C-alpha cells in the first residue's frame, strides 16, 4: 500500500533560517521572515516545551511556516505548522502520528541514497546538504557542492527543495542558480555583525524583497 503523503507546503519556501532560541524566532518573524526552523539543543525538557509552545504561537500570529526540529511529539501536541527530522530520527519518530495530526514534514538528506529514502515517505519538503563546509554542527558526510545540488534538484521535481550547509550571503546567488526553491542559513544571520542587515539582504536575494534605503 502506498505511503500517504504529508500535507503540502509552498514549492518555494524562500529564505529559511534555522535558529536555536525563541529570541531568534521573535527577531526574525518581526524582520519579515516567513519560513523558519527552531532547532533547540541542550535544554531541559520543561524549557524546551515552554519555548516550543511560545514559538508555535508566534508563528501563528505572524502566519509563518515554523518547523520544529526533532521534537515531533511536542510539535504534534501543540499543533505546530511542521516538523523537521534528520535521517537518524526517521526510524524512531511516529511518522503516522505526525501525518495524521496534519503537520508538514521536512527531511534532511546528505546523499543520493538518503534522498531516495526521503522520497518514499512523501514529505512536504526535502533538505539537500550540506552544500559547503560548515561549523554549525558536526557532519559525518562530506560537502556535496553545487554540481551535486543541481543534479538532485533536477531529480526532485515533485518536492519543494531546501539547500543547507555553509551558505553565506556571497554564495546565495550560486546556490539559487541550481534551481533550488529555498535556502537555509544559520551563521549567515546569527553570527553576522549586523543580523538585521544580513536578514534584509538575504530576503532581497532569495525572495526579491526590497531593501530599505541605506543613508
From Swiss-Prot:
The keyword Metal-binding applies. It catalyses: 2-[(2R,5Z)-2-carboxy-4-methylthiazol-5(2H)-ylidene]ethyl phosphate + 4-amino-2-methyl-5-(diphosphooxymethyl)pyrimidine + 2 H(+) = thiamine phosphate + CO2 + diphosphate; 2-(2-carboxy-4-methylthiazol-5-yl)ethyl phosphate + 4-amino-2-methyl-5-(diphosphooxymethyl)pyrimidine + 2 H(+) = thiamine phosphate + CO2 + diphosphate; 4-methyl-5-(2-phosphooxyethyl)-thiazole + 4-amino-2-methyl-5-(diphosphooxymethyl)pyrimidine + H(+) = thiamine phosphate + diphosphate. Pathway: Cofactor biosynthesis; thiamine diphosphate biosynthesis; thiamine phosphate from 4-amino-2-methyl-5-diphosphomethylpyrimidine and 4-methyl-5-(2-phosphoethyl)-thiazole: step 1/1. Mg(2+) binds at residues 70, 89. Its EC number is 2.5.1.3. GO terms for biological process: thiamine biosynthetic process; thiamine diphosphate biosynthetic process. GO terms for molecular function: magnesium ion binding; thiamine-phosphate diphosphorylase activity. It is an enzyme of class 2 (transferase). 4-amino-2-methyl-5-(diphosphooxymethyl)pyrimidine binds at residues 37-41, 69, 108, 137. Disulfide bonds: none annotated. Keywords: Magnesium, Metal-binding, Thiamine biosynthesis, Transferase. Pfam families: TMP-TENI. The keyword Metal-binding applies. It comes from the Bacteria. One of its GO terms (cellular component) is cytoplasm. SUPFAM superfamilies: Thiamin phosphate synthase (SSF51391). 2-[(2R,5Z)-2-carboxy-4-methylthiazol-5(2H)-ylidene]ethyl phosphate binds at residues 134-136, 166, 186-187. InterPro entries: Aldolase_TIM, ThiamineP_synth_sf, ThiamineP_synth_TenI, TMP_synthase. Binds 1 Mg(2+) ion per subunit. Its cofactor is Mg(2+). PANTHER family: THIAMINE-PHOSPHATE PYROPHOSPHORYLASE (PTHR20857), THIAMINE-PHOSPHATE SYNTHASE (PTHR20857:SF15). Condenses 4-methyl-5-(beta-hydroxyethyl)thiazole monophosphate (THZ-P) and 2-methyl-4-amino-5-hydroxymethyl pyrimidine pyrophosphate (HMP-PP) to form thiamine monophosphate (TMP). Belongs to the thiamine-phosphate synthase family. This is Thiamine-phosphate synthase. The gene is thiE.
Amino acid at each position: 500500500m502506498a505511503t500517504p503523503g504529508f500535507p503540502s507546503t509552498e514549492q518555494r519556501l524562500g529564505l529559511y533560517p534555522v535558529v536555536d532560541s525563541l529570541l531568534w524566532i521573535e527577531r526574525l518573524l518581526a524582520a519579515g521572515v516567513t519560513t523558519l526552523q527552531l532547532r533547540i539543543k541542550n535544554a531541559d525538557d520543561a524549557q524546551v516545551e515552554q519555548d516550543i509552545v511560545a514559538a508555535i504561537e508566534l508563528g501563528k500570529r505572524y502566519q509563518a511556516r515554523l518547523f520544529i526540529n526533532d521534537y515531533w511529539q511536542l510539535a504534534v501536541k501543540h499543533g505546530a505548522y511542521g516538523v523537521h527530522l534528520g535521517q537518524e530520527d526517521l526510524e524512531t519518530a511516529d511518522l503516522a502520528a505526525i501525518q495524521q495530526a496534519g503537520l508538514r514534514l521536512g527531511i534532511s538528506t546528505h546523499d543520493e541514497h538518503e534522498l531516495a529514502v526521503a522520497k518514499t515517505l512523501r514529505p512536504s519538503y526535502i533538505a539537500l546538504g550540506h552544500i559547503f563546509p560548515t561549523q554549525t554542527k558536526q557532519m559525518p558526510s562530506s560537502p556535496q557542492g553545487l554540481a551535486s545540488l543541481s543534479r538532485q534538484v533536477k531529480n526532485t521535481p515533485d518536492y519543494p527543495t531546501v539547500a543547507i550547509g555553509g551558505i553565506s550571503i556571497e554564495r546565495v546567488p550560486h546556490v539559487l542558480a541550481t534551481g533550488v526553491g529555498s535556502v537555509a542559513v544559520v551563521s549567515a544571520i546569527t553570527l553576522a555583525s549586523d543580523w538585521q542587515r544580513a536578514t534584509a539582504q538575504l530576503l532581497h536575494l532569495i525572495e526579491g524583497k526590497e531593501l530599505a534605503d541605506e543613508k
